Amino acid sequence: MTLKDPFNRPVSNLRVSLTPKCNLSCIYCHREGENDPKASLSAAEIAEVLRVAAGFGIRSVKFTGGEPMLRPDLTEIIRTVPAGMESSLTTNGTLLAGLAADIKQAGLRRVNVSIDSLNPETYKKITGTDVLSDVLEGINAALKTGLTPVKLNMVVLKGINDHEIDDFLAYVRGNRDLVLQLIELMNFNDCDHHGDLNGLETSLASRSKQIVTRRMHHRKKYCLDGAEVEVVRPLHNTEFCAYCNRLRLTSDGKLKPCLLRTDNHVDIRGKSGKELEDLFIEAVRRREPFYT
């Protein structure tokens, strides 16, 4: 059975926040909407959610945070992913070097690494920490262990790191296992560092040898002389909503039908079996495009 919302959008992807905790203090972080953190779901509770999700035809799960690698039971959680469901993880990379082999062995398919600067001073300004070398070591470990393709998530911050895009292109160029994702800043509080990415996309298009539209997200992938780049633009983007195929689960057990809303969550904590299945159906019923 495949779940479809009232707008005929199938749900095939689940994002699971494992913890609101993080070891960085990024200046723009919205913590996946978790501003009032409570106790996180246990590994057993997450396993039951994944079992039900698989029964509804959800074929991929991405573990997020906070920083998911702060969970001491991370490998246990990864091992509970049902057969046939692809698992990936978004991390800040600071702990990745020490865990890459273990999470790969547990069954994780690949990772996204959040890295907003290749300059140590700028990185520290953005994250509040001086650990860029650890992140770069983690990326290398992910490549070595086959957690690929490794997608590098760079949030574009006007006046801080927007001049580094060519540096990132040089970093990924020539390595087919690295993909650069340039992400529009979520401008919730009129942040001074939000910038319009129209000019950036125009520039990428003019420099590209090939432009491919990804089927899953209907997102363009720009191929620039050995470098693959995607631009992620969730704000005021009708296509982002029209092709959305995911549900989100907060670390304390609430299904989020929409990234940009906080008024339609479905609390599933402590539920299992048929009751949990019904709540999944209700969460999908509440899905509607934020931008139309």
Where are these regions (language model features)?
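A short acidic, helix-capping loop that chelates divalent metal ions and anchors anionic groups
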Residues: 34-37, 119-126, 190-191, 266-267
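Canonical Radical SAM [4Fe-4S] cluster-binding loop centered on the CxxxCxxC motif
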Residues: 5-44, 259
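N-terminal [4Fe-4S]-dependent radical SAM core
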Residues: 1-16, 25-27, 55-60, 219-238, ...
